[in-house]
Amino acid sequence: MASNKILGIDLGTTNSAFAVMEGGDPEIIVNGEGERTTPSVVAFDDGERLVGKPAKNQAVKNPDETIQSIKRHMGEDDYSVELDGEEYTPEQVSAMILQKIKHDAEEYLGDEIEKAVITVPAYFNDRQRQATKDAGEIAGFEVERIVNEPTAAAMAYGLDDESDQTVLVYDLGGGTFDVSILDLGGGVYEVVATNGDNDLGGDDWDHAIIDYLADEFEAEHGIDLRDDRQALQRLTEAAEEAKIELSSRKETRINLPFIATTDDGPLDLEQKITRAKFESLTEDLIERTVGPTEQALADADYTKSDIDEVILVGGSTRMPQVQDQVEEMTGQEPKKNVNPDEAVALGAAIQAGVLSGDVDDIVLLDVTPLSLGVEVKGGLFERLIDKNTTIPTEESKIFTTAQDNQTQVQIRVFQGEREIAEENELLGAFALSGIPPAPAGTPQIEVSFNIDENGIVNVEAEDKGSGNKEDITIEGGAGLSDDQIEEMQQEAEQHAEEDEQRRERIEARNEAEASVRRAETLLDENEEEIDEDLQSDIEAKIEDVEEVLEDEDATKEDYEAVTETLSEELQEIGKQMYQDQAQQAAGGAAGAGPGGAAGPGGAAGPGGAAGGAAEQGEEYVDADFEDVEESDEDE
């Protein structure tokens, strides 16, 4: 049965998180691995699709079939990746991550989840927003709302604070940077201005370390480790770990044995990096956050003295270098009471609660991050909606023809801040035909822009003379049609069925292995009490199970069949031992007299010991079963 809950999802570049409203408060949901964040990593290993931690864990040995940071390519219609011999768009890869999130949330809540609120960087353009919405639909969600990440974080911060205040949200994630300024008060969250850089994030700090290590190694040994995919993946993981360590330590040491091989043998990489060195390597990156921050303040017509609170969002804000820069720019120490990895997901859950009716008295007024307009004569960009306009919104403007007797106009829709249309992002184009022939400048063509609450754009053009109309909803990424989305949904569902079948087979195999252990324990501990013929039968059945376990092509049914046969033999042992124990107890009671309770046939006799071993075996098998299942997911 489907739940009426709406899931709040932070679909991140390096990690994702998801939350739901419980008892009036947003709560992070732990994933299938028991963790509060999920790596945004997808891989195929021998045809098996892995998502999250299992995918990240095998990246070094399988770099060619592992995809990370796909969010950086959302909305790029000419970008795809090859996995397991097939081409996938960024929307499809993101959908695989969202599908795992959906599955884990449903397992945690015990209900089907059909609806979601998904966050995006505030500076995402229309294509990227639509691509994110498409990914959610491919994964099987009804995407109720697309929310800007800094806005969501502010909601998580201000849920229990009714005071009026101006908040600056500094959001440095794995792949994007946003800064937003919001006015909070009386349950209203109004975004005043936003700015950012979609090509700046924690990955870039990692790359700075990677390049430093690779350059040092090449200078010493003449080998560029970046040319070897496996070596590069090891460098990437080591760089990320070093970055994290340097947030709490003054120096760290990187040690990668056998990173390369020469005719003289293997080579190791050993390098010490101090925090000072790391900060000097990334000084240009931190400087890139200054311009957007100052621009957001200018757009809001605020100075840093107008800011009451500063909130840090994104794991990359844990770097001391970043915190120092933020304090220098804003004149105050950032708040530390919001978990930078979880705030966005918690805010998304709050917005989901608003939509589902679980949260009252909250109003979200977000803005469009970039100006929207059309190309006019001379290739100029004519704005219809300025950046930082509160959404939803609608604007119209009258245009005319440039030539005599022109019967068709091409409407080209752009988003950006450059004065030349071609230097901005082309969102889409369509033609309006059937304009009655007339001298240039005579026809009146009304172009209307509409931006919904998700920040997704619809453009309509109407010839006022003839009444002819055309419109376009700007599509994201590859411009996925409903049919394409449905096809991808079916593909995702097919993978879900395959995953379920794989899980059932693994469970059947685990039970077969456990039945062998139970049988062997029983035989070892009760060899004297078990009939020789019955013992031979059990040993034969154990061999049958082990033979199936050695067969890589064995099916779930194969495992279940041999397990059932062995279990039946174990039941026969149980019957025999029970009868023997009953007879011993009767004999002891008949011959012991007043001291019978302490006689040799009491509860501590051989039958009792066997019963105790069986019970311990059951407990051991349950724990081992869970370990095997978890281990399989992690492989």
Curated annotation (Swiss-Prot):
Pfam families named among the record's database cross-references: HSP70
GO molecular function, one term: unfolded protein binding
SUPFAM superfamilies assigned: Actin-like ATPase domain (SSF53067), Heat shock protein 70kD (HSP70), C-terminal subdomain (SSF100934), Heat shock protein 70kD (HSP70), peptide-binding domain (SSF100920)
Family designation: Belongs to the heat shock protein 70 family.
Disordered as annotated region, ranges: 487-538, 575-635
Compositionally skewed regions (Gly residues) per UniProt: 588-611
InterPro entries the record matches: ATPase_NBD, Chaperone_DnaK, Heat_shock_70_CS, HSP70_C_sf, HSP70_peptide-bd_sf, Hsp_70_fam
Lineage: Archaea, Methanobacteriati, Methanobacteriota, Stenosarchaea group, Halobacteria
Organism of derivation: Haloarcula marismortui (strain ATCC 43049 / DSM 3752 / JCM 8966 / VKM B-1809) (Halobacterium marismortui)
Segments of skewed composition (Basic and acidic residues): 492-521
Lipid biosynthesis recorded as keyword: no
Protein name (record): Chaperone protein DnaK
